């Protein structure tokens, strides 16, 4: 078993820029240009991640995607073709569940970013709403990004790819990764394809898991090589963090994250 992808993501900037390092999905197809208007590229000194625009001023991503000199790009479909409505932003503020930015307890890998300037809805930019209810085990979920489409050797395309995967009971991930000592209960989601072949991968961290049209998860980590049988990925559960997200957006910067008894 290789290093988990949360670590591999931090090494992605060492790749040649000739490879077009960004975000993508193993076993997927090119996304429809109209289905990812909320998708953000999150670029820092140490990593390339993705994020999700949840209103004109706020982006959700993974805490481990934090780094210096962060740039956020919205409205991108083809990295070699610039659209008139593409937007670049930097963070005005970043908020974390833990003041120490410690995501090693797995349930706290979430970061809320306030953009320095709000974006406007356009042909290629529009937010994705927060979920109104939790997801159901067995749901078919959509993942997307510009990350590597091959693993362990990495190949980066110019356009985002999308794939459908399944939402499992959390116990499936407990059984898949016994060596990590995962907590018995968790505010994360477990998703993938048990027979392998489709998966998120290096560079997709922080990206959305969309189940039945609702934004339910933020990619946290998975196995490397990607898309192996019976080794699904782990996603921060957005629904369980709604109170924290909405409180921060409303101006309560002292809001605390939900507690899990480990």
UniProtKB/Swiss-Prot annotation:
Q: What's one Pfam family the UniProt record gives for this protein?
A: Trypsin
MF term (GO), any? serine-type endopeptidase activity
Q: Where does it reside?
A: Secreted
Q: Which residues are glycosylated?
A: 78, 102, 153
Q: Which cysteines are joined by disulfide bonds?
A: 31-162, 49-65, 97-257, 141-211, 173-190, 201-226
Q: One GO biological process from the UniProt record?
A: proteolysis
Xref: InterPro entries: Peptidase_S1_PA (IPR009003), Peptidase_S1_PA_chymotrypsin (IPR043504), Peptidase_S1A (IPR001314), Trypsin_dom (IPR001254), TRYPSIN_HIS (IPR018114)
> What quaternary structure, including any partners, is listed in this protein's UniProt entry?
Monomer.
Q: Please report the name of this protein according to its UniProt entry.
A: Inactive snake venom serine proteinase 13
What UniProt keywords apply to this chain's record, in alphabetical order?
Disulfide bond, Glycoprotein, Secreted, Serine protease homolog, Signal, Toxin
The Peptidase S1 domain sits at 25-250
Q: What's any one GO cellular component for it? A: extracellular region
Family of the protein in this entry: Belongs to the peptidase S1 family. Snake venom subfamily.
Tissue specificity statement from the Swiss-Prot or TrEMBL entry: Expressed by the venom gland.
Q: Does Cell cycle appear among the keywords?
A: no
User: Which residue ranges make up the pro-region?
Assistant: 19-24
Major place of residence = secreted
Answer whether the UniProt record assigns the keyword Transferase to this protein: no
Which segment of the chain is annotated as a signal peptide?
1-18
